[in-house]
Design a protein with these regions (language model features):
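Cleavable N-terminal export/targeting peptides
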Residues: 1-21
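Short, glycine/acidic-rich beta->alpha junctions
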Residues: 164
Length: 198
């Protein structure tokens, strides 16, 4: 029911994407859930170069919940007539302890038809340190105009050093105006990402 409501919302909002930094002075709300964690994240971008935010995390794997203070910085952006490339560094510190923190790098490249991205995140926790690797590749079945509903058919592959194996699964990305939703499933677990910019 929640997914249906989010999908309907997409049709009524005035293209944006899942980049971790908004326009200068912009804010973003994000919701993510998968088999390991659920998180609610708000960030503000004083400029297009960086964002600062706070995140509530429900860690299902380690059975704990906490807040993260997070920051993301745009290292490099390259625009051409047909594509855009972005590279970011990110980091955060937990409300539990200064010894609970994370840092990483992620980037993306896209045309109006093709999307590719990667992420590497190192997470330090009192219980166990681990890393997460992720790659995404997608294609748009059609090229929409500015105010259209845009769709991407995607493949995601992920590996963390807890489970220590690569998992590949499909998902769909939809966005219109300032709203984005990604929905996928693996091993009967939903992988959902919802984003709203304002």
């Amino acid at each position: 029911k929640k997914i249906l409501i989010l999908g309907i919302m997409l049709c009524y909002v005035n293209i944006s994407d899942a980049r971790p930094i908004s326009w200068s002075g912009g804010s973003t709300l994000m919701y993510k859930t998968n088999f390991m964690t659920t998180s609610y994240y708000y960030h503000y971008s004083p400029t297009y170069k960086y964002s600062l935010g706070i995140e509530y995390v429900d860690d299902k794997y380690f059975k704990e919940d906490y807040l993260n203070l997070r920051a993301t910085y745009l290292i490099n952006r390259k625009n051409t007539k047909k594509s855009q490339r972005n590279l970011y560094v990110t980091g955060g510190i937990s409300s539990e302890s200064i010894n609970n923190f994370n840092y990483g790098i992620h980037g993306d490249w896209e045309t109006r038809r093709i999307f590719a991205s990667f992420a590497y995140i190192n997470k330090h926790k009192k219980i166990k340190n681990y890393t997460e690797n992720e790659f995404q590749l997608g294609i748009a079945p059609y090229v929409g105009e500015y105010n259209d509903l845009h769709a991407w058919i995607m493949l995601k592959t992920k590996k963390d050093t807890i489970n220590n194996n690569w998992e590949i699964y499909p998902f769909i990305k939809l966005f219109k105006g300032d709203v984005l939703i990604e929905i996928g499933t693996k091993n009967s677990h939903w992988d959902v990402h919802y984003m709203f910019r304002f």
